[in-house]
């Protein structure tokens, strides 16, 4: 990453990806209350989508290689599928 993006763009990626984990932890603790559970999972999904946007920018601007981008994109999509499974099937998580 160039100097001007080293902290800005990487910080956005770091913060949005960590937010996915933090919101997932909160949602799981609130799983007894279906609306809270789904609400927090919706935040997870939004943060995961934001992470994907920053990864797309990183690739398009030439900061990461095609291989790294593809690997991270596939992982991001898998996380999104799992989050959406939880949103659509809350009863399977102790709700």
Language-model features: locations:
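Amphipathic alpha-helical assembly/interaction segments
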Residues: 1-95
């Amino acid at each position: 990453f160039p100097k001007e993006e080293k902290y800005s763009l990487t910080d956005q990626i770091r913060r949005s990806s960590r937010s996915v984990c933090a919101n997932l932890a909160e949602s799981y603790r609130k799983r007894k209350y279906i609306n809270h559970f789904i609400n927090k999972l919706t935040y997870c999904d939004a943060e995961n989508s934001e992470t994907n946007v920053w990864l797309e920018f990183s690739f398009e601007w030439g900061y990461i290689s095609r291989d790294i981008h593809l690997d991270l994109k596939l992982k991001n999509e898998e996380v999104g599928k799992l989050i959406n499974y939880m949103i659509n099937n809350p009863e399977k998580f102790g709700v």
